[in-house]
Amino acid sequence: MNLLDIINKAKAEKAKTLDLSQQGLRLLPPELFEIQSLEELNLDRNKLVELPDDIGLLKNLKSLSVSENDLMELPDTIGNLTALEHLYLGYNSLSELPATVGNLTNLHTVNIAKNQLLEFPDEIGNWAKVVKLSLHDNMLTTIPDSVGKLKNLVKLYLDNNDLTEVPASLGNLASLEILMISGNQLSVIPQEFGKLSKLRELVLDANQLETLPEALADCKSLETISINENPMEDGLPRAILDKKGLKIDQ
């Protein structure tokens, strides 16, 4: 079957899932956006440079995967997909996201790793249900304070960016268990990280850290800190060194 046959069949059957991965697609036919029943759409490994505005018509979508394409931007209409729970955009060429992504308040998992993001919109603070956020291997220089509002976030991946600092508001992530920030330009870690009561693993390799805040000893669930490839000229505070059950990888 050719592409239009596949799409027409899915429309006739009121399909909930459609896999159009690895089809060599450069453009998406308008007929695709007439399948109002769609809840899951896979467009991975194509040659898409953009998503058309009509993507916003698929209002029942719960999962959208457009990984390993050539996307350079997202349309504002992405914000119309308010039922979306899973958004996968890894391995593209996105340099920014529209502010309308803040409308996607039902998101649970978001992967925008391996892009060219320079910044992230403040509206990320609306993603209160997000559990896993992957932003590693981008070109981020800052993270908005609003990320501290993600009360259900368990895993945050910020490794291999250009961050010189991270906001103190990260200390408000009450559910956070895994925080990866290796391969950045960090010289200090905020004292507020000591409030991360569920944090188990903190990876800070390959930064510019001279020491760590003593407050990290207050992270009662902390099992592992990794600080390889840091200057650490001031050493670690005694409270961290003496913390029972803590493995320090350096």
Predicted regions mapped to residue ranges:
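The feature captures the LRR N-terminal capping module
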Residues: 1-180, 187, 191, 195-203, ...
